[in-house]
Amino acid sequence: MQIDLNADLGEGCGNDEALLALISSANVACGWHAGDAATMLQTVKWAIEKGVAIGAHPSFPDRENFGRTEMQRDPEAVYADVLYQIGALAAMVRAQGGQLHHVKPHGALYNQAARDPALAEAIVRAVRDFDSDLIFFGLAGSKMIDVARKAGLRVKEEVFADRGYNADGSLVKRGTPGALHEDEEVALNQTLTMVREQRVRAIDGNWVPIRAETVCLHGDGDHALAFARRIRERLGAEGIAVRAGA
């Protein structure tokens, strides 16, 4: 058995180089919610050195709120936003002799697209038009996975180590009870259950089927690095290899 571990990097959290030794895929902020040209280039260099798959992590234009504020943007504007950000990161990857591997939307763009097919279509179209060989990372079982698959893109269904789930498979909204698992053991056990059993316990206590193809480890928490090490150790002990895959 194998699983991909991904993390959102280039967001100014200071753990990036160390985290890259523990993950298999990196989602690099493209400057619209965090980061800038210098952080993008540095993160790309580190990822190439460590053999980590590189993905673009496009956002709504929202640096003030770290890309976590929902917006009602015209689909054509979103298409242009995403295409612009992918292109910027891809240029840096290419200049360093690497190859862009995937695209994962960030924050509010991700969460809205998970339930809004029109928004998802704009994002997916930008990815496909830029490079139809790119892999699309999206919330497991969501509308954006369906849209990406129908558009002919390869997908990876994403689950979250430290986030709570609703009964419909959506993430519990940040700022509400149960949104984040502060207890590392709870997050570790949730991750192993999702990977091995392809299910997750929702906040209402019921089990929800879930397809876990890539696990997101948040890189912006106080204990992000220590938690990533524990995840790697537990996966290794269970005989589960960590690989980006194709």
UniProtKB/Swiss-Prot annotation:
GO terms for molecular function, please? Answer: 5-oxoprolinase (ATP-hydrolyzing) activity; ATP binding
- Tell me its EC number(s), please: 3.5.2.9
**Keywords annotated in UniProt:** ATP-binding, Hydrolase, Nucleotide-binding
Looking up InterPro entries in the UniProt record yields: Glyco_hydro/deAcase_b/a-brl, LamB/YcsF/PxpA-like
Q: Which reaction does it catalyse?
A: 5-oxo-L-proline + ATP + 2 H2O = L-glutamate + ADP + phosphate + H(+)
In terms of superkingdom, the source organism counts as: Bacteria
**What Pfam families does this protein map onto?**
LamB_YcsF
Q: Identify the CDD domains for this entry.
A: LamB_YcsF_YbgL_like
Q: Example GO biological process term?
A: carbohydrate metabolic process
| Keyword set includes rRNA processing | no
**What role does it play?**
Catalyzes the cleavage of 5-oxoproline to form L-glutamate coupled to the hydrolysis of ATP to ADP and inorganic phosphate.
* HAMAP family in UniProt: PxpA (MF_00691)
Question: Quaternary arrangement and interactors, per the entry?
Answer: Forms a complex composed of PxpA, PxpB and PxpC.
Family designation: Belongs to the LamB/PxpA family.
Instruction: Write down what this protein is called.
Output: 5-oxoprolinase subunit A
UniProt organism field: Cupriavidus pinatubonensis (strain JMP 134 / LMG 1197)
Which gene is transcribed and translated to give this protein? pxpA
